[in-house]
Amino acid sequence: MSESKGYQVNKQILAATTLSVGATSGIGSIASQPRITRWYARLRKPSYVPPNGVFPVAWTTLYADIAVTSATAIDRLRAAGRDKEARNYVVALAANLILNAGWSWLFFKYQKLGASAIGAAVLAASSADLARRAAAADPRAGAALVPYPLWCVFATVMSAHIWLLNRR
């Protein structure tokens, strides 16, 4: 993700972003325990919703991407003396990860379909902002992060459609 072939991201920064993303994944997964998945199976869903097995693969890939690209962006910003931008990136990442885990709680745990559709839209906007910030630090990191907001837009469409199909 850099112009030089020998670039290695700062291991401490990578460890911090990996732990943060891992915590997000864990907190989000608590909300979707087996009892909740039975509820999800009973929901009316549009035909384009992927099979359940796609979601853990997609999210594991996206979480790894978020950790690596965010570490790269933060490291690049700090190395360039752009400390304020690095701090702002960390704040934006933290907010994004809170929104990310929060969606699972809104949708699965609290079964608030309308609120989760709105939450997904806010997460998509936050994810696009994160990709923009990453691109400002390192264009390749920004490009590598683009699948995240795209998936979040897809999740927004799915969430909204599920909400519409299941309104009472």
Question: Which residues make up each language-model segment?
Answer:
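Short amphipathic, positively biased membrane-proximal segments
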Residues: 1-168
